[in-house]
Regions:
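Conserved, non-catalytic sequence blocks in retroelement Pol enzymes and Pol-derived host proteins
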Residues: 26, 168-170, 256-263, 354-356
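Cytochrome P450 heme-thiolate monooxygenase catalytic core
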Residues: 30-217, 238
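Cytochrome P450 I-helix active-site segment
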Residues: 34, 53, 58, 98, ...
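Cytochrome P450 heme-binding "Cys pocket" and the immediately downstream C-terminal segment
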Residues: 43-50, 229-235, 340, 357-394
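Short, small-residue alpha-helix embedded
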Residues: 212-228, 367
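Conserved cytochrome P450 K-helix/beta-meander segment immediately N-terminal to the heme-binding cysteine loop
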Residues: 303, 309-337
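C-terminal helix/juxtamembrane-tail motif
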Residues: 392-407
Length: 407
């Protein structure tokens, strides 16, 4: 659906897929998220107690970025394909791939494949004349990028095949996940998706729901701790206090019902999404041939013009957000101006806005809520470095972690 340019076909696909992200469907996804969070917490507890890594304040040192990736990939694997990739349990970036359906199973780095795919896709999207030649260019950027696209397709083929084979044999599917919703979905004529279309849409969910969530959750984690470092006792203590009042001390994993309406948690998430801007470059939009063009700020853009709104730029404009635009200030969200409300677009707008944004917000609230309810952190990362492809990825995020004493 993501790269369909025909409006009628995009509308058809979106109507089918939107059922998988209805409020009722999203609520059914929570148990899968919680199961993966529970496995993640076991690993974080181990890091927090790892004696060789403890510093003088009993924080276990770790690079948080890979662990956000492992969790996000396992959750989307569970939701889109029927089982997690197992990255959290293994503690490394590795999953099964099958380049040709029915062919040999091999192992590939899913996170690296997503990264390389994002780089080559954004490059070829801006330079489409290179697309037919990409496979033949001797530059490793292109050869590895093309291989990454094949590996990602193979991951989807390997993960989806067993579910589809079971459905073809009439075996009942009791799971409540994205793939089950896609299997049940029908278009306006009553026709379900074909096998190739299902694999393509499941792959789209993998791409859309893995890297973006891992990058954003790591960005939120960093900016909360960075904001606390710049203004001690103004961020983390408020967040933990709000979580403690809503959840209590005994829970290891938060429930969505406990965190979905917590105002300071949501302000922290929104403020960090503003500062981080995962889809920083802006998504391209074509001025329709059927229109007279677009007028904006005294400029005329004729039909056929490709436009985009770079989220990072508008999220960091002083004339919109004020002189403290680069500061992490969750309370700015208490009194947003109309212009600020329009300018904040982490999920884009209109018929091509992110169809899974409700799932993403639920996931972020569960992840950040669980982290700061269960642990104390120390931020060792001086500043956050980023690598930009299709999305804006934190390079690393070194921190200390220890279990909280909530009594």
């Amino acid at each position: 659906m993501f790269n369909v340019r025909d409006r009628a076909e995009h509308t058809r696909k979106r109507k089918i897929i939107s059922h998988a992200f209805s409020p009722r469907s999203v609520a059914a996804f929570e148990p899968h998220m919680v199961d993966n969070l529970r496995r993640w917490v076991v690993q974080l507890d181990r890091i927090a107690a790892s004696r060789p890594q403890l510093d003088e304040e009993n924080f276990g040192r770790f690079n948080a970025m890979p662990w956000f990736s492992y969790l996000a990939f396992d959750i989307i694997g569970d939701l889109a394909f029927g089982s997690p990739f197992g990255m959290v349990n293994r503690g490394r970036d590795e999953t099964q791939t099958q380049i040709v359906e029915g062919g040999a199973i091999s192992y590939a780095s899913a996170v690296e494949a997503i990264n390389r795919r994002g780089e080559i896709s954004s490059t070829l999207g801006l330079l489409p004349a290179l697309r037919p030649w990409a496979t033949y260019l001797p530059d490793p950027f292109f050869t590895k990028g093309v291989a990454a696209v094949e590996n990602l397709t193979g991951i989807a083929v390997a993960a989806v095949a067993s579910r589809l084979d079971a459905a073809d044999k009439g075996i009942a599917d009791s799971r409540n996940d994205i793939l089950s919703r896609l299997l049940q979905a029908k278009d306006a004529s009553g026709h379900p998706m074909g096998r190739d279309e299902l694999i393509a849409e499941a792959l789209t969910q993998l791409i859309a729901g893995s890297d973006t969530v891992s990058n954003t959750s790591c960005g939120i984690f960093y900016y909360i701790l960075h904001g606390e470092r710049n203004a001690p006792n103004t961020i983390v203590s408020r967040l933990q206090g709000e979580l403690d009042r809503a959840i209590g001390c005994e829970a290891d994993i938060v429930n969505y019902s406990q965190v979905k309406d917590l105002p300071f948690l949501r302000r922290c998430i929104d403020e960090a999404m503003r500062l981080h801007s995962t889809s920083a470059i802006g998504l391209p939009r074509l001025v329709a041939d059927s229109s007279l063009g677009v007028e904006f700020d005294g400029f005329h853009f004729p039909p056929g013009t490709v436009l985009s709104v770079p989220s990072y730029t508008i999220h960091h404009m002083k004339e919109i957000w004020g002189d403290d635009v680069e500061d992490f200030k969750p309370d700015r969200w208490l009194n947003l101006t109309p212009r600020q409300k329009i300018a904040f677009n982490p999920f884009s707008y209109g018929p091509r806005a992110c169809v899974g944004q409700n799932v993403a917000i639920m996931e972020l609230q569960l992840i950040i809520g669980t982290l700061f309810h269960r642990y104390d952190f120390a931020l060792y990362q001086p500043t956050m470095g980023f690598h930009e492809g299709f999305s804006k990825k934190p390079k690393e995020c070194h921190a200390g972690i220890r279990l909280r004493n909530q009594n």
